[in-house]
Swiss-Prot record:
Formation of pseudouridine at positions 38, 39 and 40 in the anticodon stem and loop of transfer RNAs. Substrate binds at residue 118. The record marks 58, 78, 110, 126, 139 as: Interaction with tRNA. GO terms for biological process: tRNA pseudouridine synthesis. It catalyses: uridine(38/39/40) in tRNA = pseudouridine(38/39/40) in tRNA. Its EC number is 5.4.99.12. This is tRNA pseudouridine synthase A. Residues 107-111 are annotated as: RNA binding. One of its GO terms (molecular function) is RNA binding. The active site is at residue 60. Keywords: Isomerase, tRNA processing. Homodimer. Residues 168-172 are annotated as: Interaction with tRNA.
Length: 270
């Protein structure tokens, strides 16, 4: 057995924040920019060996993350500062490591997760924003956030989300368990906050697209429940844009003792 094979292997978890507006999603792909590719390149430079990361949730093109979690294995012994400050120095400005934690062998960023939480941010104003144009979704018709919240409560619990599932979704089942869904207004911002054990493809954006129709009084409050029961994607509203969506938190069993920083995005109070 070579000396290289005898080196100890370290398993490391990282919290990652990124502005997804300039990336073709999280997942590494040929010939297009991805968050995974940039992160692996920076980690490999610090480790001085090739690094492959596994994430809690693969976000789509244009979607952001403030609470993404990844893990990787390495034979490179490094201090925490190397995996945070050192990696950040090698990352583009729109991706950053928020925290680092050594984890046991049985930890997996995706398969150990018990829930994911997303926030969808709508800038509800007659005029479009400029500074946050890629960080929020603009909707000019006045929205009734309380009406949206009431309509959304039928989605709680375990349900078949076929009506809110992208046609190209590869998940084996449309059933998901929604733990909470809250719609609140913060000045001109309407925030849809949803937590579930997992999500089918485009589930949050499809739910938000239909909730905006309810909030604008284009559909009755009962419409969301009717869509859920119909199990027909063609009956629901168009998919909401990617710009307003953030993966803000991932839950894990307490025994892993992972950090829980403020969820953000930073222009919102927690």
């Amino acid at each position: 057995m070579s000396d290289q094979q005898q080196l100890p292997v370290y398993k490391i978890a990282l919290g990652i924040e990124y502005d997804g507006s300039k990336y073709y999603g999280w997942q590494r792909q040929n010939e297009v920019r991805s968050v995974q590719e940039k992160l692996e390149k920076a980690l490999s430079q610090v480790a001085n060996e090739p690094i492959t990361v596994f994430c809690a949730g693969r976000t789509d093109a244009g979607v952001h993350g403030t609470g993404q979690v990844v893990h990787f294995e390495t034979t490179a012994p490094r201090k925490d500062a190397a995996w945070t400050l050192g990696v950040n120095a090698n990352l583009p400005d729109d991706i950053a490591v928020r925290w680092v934690k050594a984890v046991p062998d049985d930890f997996h960023a995706r398969f150990s997760a018990t829930a994911r939480r997303y926030r969808y941010i709508i800038y509800n104003h007659r005029l479009r924003p400029a500074v946050l144009s890629k960080g929020v979704t603009h909707f000019y018709e006045p929205l009734d956030a309380e009406r949206m919240h009431r309509a959304a409560q039928c989605l709680l619990g375990e349900n078949d989300f076929t009506s809110f599932r992208a046609v190209q979704c590869q998940s084996r089942t449309p059933w998901r368990n929604v733990m909470h869904i809250n719609v609140t207004r913060h000045g001109p911002y309407v925030v849809v906050d949803i937590k579930a054990n997992a999500f089918v493809h485009h589930m949050v954006r499809n739910i938000v697209g239909s909730l905006m129709e309810v909030g604008a009084h284009n559909q009755p409050e009962s419409w969301i429940a009717e869509l859920l029961a119909a199990k027909d994607r063609t009956l629901a509203a168009a998919t909401a844009k990617a710009e307003g969506l953030y993966l803000v938190a991932v839950d894990y069993p307490d025994r892993y003792d992972l950090p829980k920083p403020p969820m953000g995005p930073l222009f919102l109070a927690d």
